[in-house]
């Protein structure tokens, strides 16, 4: 049975730089009993039925459409914009995206573990400019966000 666990961001990961006072950072991981390449993970993540639902919401509410072809291009480092996000940083086996408002980060990483692959998904939320803490709206949605993050890795 697949299990998803909360963990700290791996040391020296692209997400780790957002670990500072006032920011919210989370990281979840699961292990798959087969080799999974980074492009396969990124494409698979952004084309699940659950994430496609988020993509539809983004298209309807903020006019940020996306396609499976764009998810494939993102996974192959052919484009730097996808739906509501822009690539902030990439390295071998990981990607950090920033939303169009500049407050939320989305992060994916793969780590080979013998014949298995460890998959990571994390988020960072930074306070609004001029604020030292996250606003009530985000804090109110935190429980939903955490459950949603876990479901995205199933």
Protein language model features and the residues they cover:
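Intrinsic-disorder/low-complexity, polar/charged segments enriched in Ser/Thr/Lys/Arg/Asp/Glu/Gln
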Residues: 25-29, 94, 118-120
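Hydrophobic ligand-binding cavity/cleft-lining segments
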Residues: 1-68
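Beta-strand/loop substructures that line and gate deep hydrophobic ligand-binding cavities in soluble
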Residues: 102-143
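Short aromatic-glycine motifs in intrinsically disordered, low-complexity regions
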Residues: 68-78
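Long, compositionally biased interface segments
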Residues: 145-154
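Hydrophobic-ligand binding "helix-grip"
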Residues: 76-115
């Amino acid at each position: 049975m697949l299990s998803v666990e909360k963990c700290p961001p791996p040391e020296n990961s692209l997400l780790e730089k957002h670990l500072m006072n006032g920011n919210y950072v989370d990281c979840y991981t699961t292990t798959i009993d087969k080799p999974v390449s980074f492009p396969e993970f990124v494409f698979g993540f952004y084309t699940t039925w659950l994430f496609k639902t988020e993509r539809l919401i983004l298209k309807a509410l903020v006019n940020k459409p996306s396609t499976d072809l764009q998810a494939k291009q993102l996974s192959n480092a052919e484009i730097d914009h996808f739906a509501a996000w822009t690539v902030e940083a990439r390295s071998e086996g990981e990607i950090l995206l920033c939303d169009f408002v500049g407050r939320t980060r989305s992060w994916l990483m793969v780590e080979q573990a013998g014949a298995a692959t460890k998959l990571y998904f994390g988020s960072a939320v930074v306070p609004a400019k001029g604020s030292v803490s996250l606003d009530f709206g985000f804090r109110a949605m935190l429980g939903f966000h955490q459950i949603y993050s876990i479901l995205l890795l199933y």
